[in-house]
Swiss-Prot record:
Upper taxonomic lineage: Eukaryota, Viridiplantae, Streptophyta, Embryophyta, Tracheophyta
Name this polypeptide is given: Putative G-type lectin S-receptor-like serine/threonine-protein kinase At1g61610
GO biological process, one term: recognition of pollen
Assigned EC number: 2.7.11.1
Bridged cysteine pairs (disulfide): 296-308, 302-319, 385-406, 389-395
Residues that span the membrane, as ranges: 444-464
Domain Protein kinase: 525-814
Amino acid sequence: MAGFNRNLTLVTTLLIFHQLCSNVSCSTSNSFTRNHTIREGDSLISEDESFELGFFTPKNSTLRYVGIWYKNIEPQTVVWVANREKPLLDHKGALKIADDGNLVIVNGQNETIWSTNVEPESNNTVAVLFKTGDLVLCSDSDRRKWYWESFNNPTDTFLPGMRVRVNPSLGENRAFIPWKSESDPSPGKYSMGIDPVGALEIVIWEGEKRKWRSGPWNSAIFTGIPDMLRFTNYIYGFKLSSPPDRDGSVYFTYVASDSSDFLRFWIRPDGVEEQFRWNKDIRNWNLLQWKPSTECEKYNRCGNYSVCDDSKEFDSGKCSCIDGFEPVHQDQWNNRDFSGGCQRRVPLNCNQSLVAGQEDGFTVLKGIKVPDFGSVVLHNNSETCKDVCARDCSCKAYALVVGIGCMIWTRDLIDMEHFERGGNSINIRLAGSKLGGGKENSTLWIIVFSVIGAFLLGLCIWILWKFKKSLKAFLWKKKDITVSDIIENRDYSSSPIKVLVGDQVDTPDLPIFSFDSVASATGDFAEENKLGQGGFGTVYKGNFSEGREIAVKRLSGKSKQGLEEFKNEILLIAKLQHRNLVRLLGCCIEDNEKMLLYEYMPNKSLDRFLFDESKQGSLDWRKRWEVIGGIARGLLYLHRDSRLKIIHRDLKASNILLDTEMNPKISDFGMARIFNYRQDHANTIRVVGTYGYMAPEYAMEGIFSEKSDVYSFGVLILEIVSGRKNVSFRGTDHGSLIGYAWHLWSQGKTKEMIDPIVKDTRDVTEAMRCIHVGMLCTQDSVIHRPNMGSVLLMLESQTSQLPPPRQPTFHSFLNSGDIELNFDGHDVASVNDVTFTTIVGR
């Protein structure tokens, strides 16, 4: 009897538990039916435990919402909100399936505040949270029959697998609307979506006003984002459904190259689109790209009929009118207000009584983001496209765009941007008088210009002949220049340098050597005198008759280090005098030959000793300490103490040369930039440097400053102390030497980073302090990095208290394959000052 009672009690308990579970979610199921209710503390979890649905409260708020977020990611990252316009005021709300089969949210009074508001075939429905983050309401008997899904009702986040519908024929689109603020999920004033009335392109609106657009889709990329061709692994994986649905609808979707990655696009409350990837190693979101990211990406930044060019400084004029146009308000343009745009100098002649030969014509602009509001006509032939535009007097321009076809513009040409790489050619309609005049006078003008051209050509040939004759005579006299002449600082500067660098700068007192004298010193560039080779050309050892050894950098005709870098090095290094900077002895400029002559460094470069196990023993701790200090003093001289404020931009182990006494000398100033002393940073489109040494703001945004050199110096410190290359950690859990340093630091094991060759030295404290300083120098944010004056003080003052470094994130991003870089040379141990790697950010 007692046993029977115990069994009865157990059965009763199970029945009660079952009844409770019919009213609340007692498991981590990914679905629920009419018999279940999601209340406070309950949640749905996707099958792979990637996403979670439940109740949440935003930061700095007391209101409650139902949303979807990434499970096990902190801080909580919400990707969808149901009741964003009608929050719950307390914790008494519930999510359930109503009697009509709709998914609803009710408050404590059982009033519906949000509903899917569809008409299911029956009320036998089920809500399922898929591993893509999509919440679906479907038939419980046939789960292939979907009635509603969150992916079709997005808030501010676009996830891989989401299909964004647009119907150009009906002018319908699906917009992503950001939160009003980080604590208020209600709809903000911005929106992002596919343009429903024009070309298939992404647009960000501020109310009804456009803020940014991507340019039309050409079946591979959005034409206004040419970088999509170079960021294929993670950043872009867009696809367009083809053919359209019966009603004309098409769908954009995004497919990640690695389905295990968490990627998300979202639009911030301030109207900026961003893309992130979750870094599992450091458990942080890596920012991959954002739009608009430059001045010229802002919508119609320069006004109508004007082109914006980010490679130019804004103060000096990023904006320029198209040929044949002029500023509407010249006084505003003089004050750098370009919003008024440009207007035609001469009206078009279409449909007017014309003088023969005065018909309108076209001028071409290349590398352009095509204007907004273009129309696509079904022609794929350039001449046919031109004829279509020429016959239409309202046509302002045309372009034949690969993947789209013939596009014409009948409205004002707006939102044009020039790209360094990529872009399209657009043909602008101009009055015939702006294209060279009428046919009646064309023969006369051809004759006149031909005569003038022939005269000028003959004059140029004569001047060039006289110049080369004088130059050869000069160089012949200089064949016997000796190194002792150089040491005595005799002035051998002459016209070739003036021709090279121009009269606008002070010409350095730099000796010029003839090609024959350099060839003689290097044994006609003998193979046995070759010291090394890189993307720039070849380096040779040379000996003058007095016995003085030199190193000769002979630039090849195909050198990536072109005339500008050659000029840069002559102008900079010839003016700099410091014991920790390499000394330039002279140059050779003859015909197509460009050569630089340096003092010879018998121990060559730091990387040969640092990363070669057979030579590491030559660098004991005392010598490494002196090398670190010498480099720091050389950098401080460049940044603060020289006549010029110079940012090196390519500081690395292979550009640190070692003399006979192993004293370090910074070399290779081909990529350096001069700042004035009130300037703290600059921008560039052409990002140059070396993989593993580039600061995040420089690699990602083209912004560089003395803090960029500080970052490179920090990497160099860590390499010197550890004896390991920064890039040797690529593909590991740490991502880079910086990540490895942080890993050991956070676990209190910094000592393990010290090179075993010097680990047993009595100066371990000194080595650990260097690691600490290196980590401070490689912090992600510019404002957190010390300047070189502070760095030198930290190194030399062993008693001062150092601030703790911040956890790095950028190092892992660079090493994850998210950024693709062009390598113009191989990363090998260099010789003397000559091997360098130029990297262009892609």
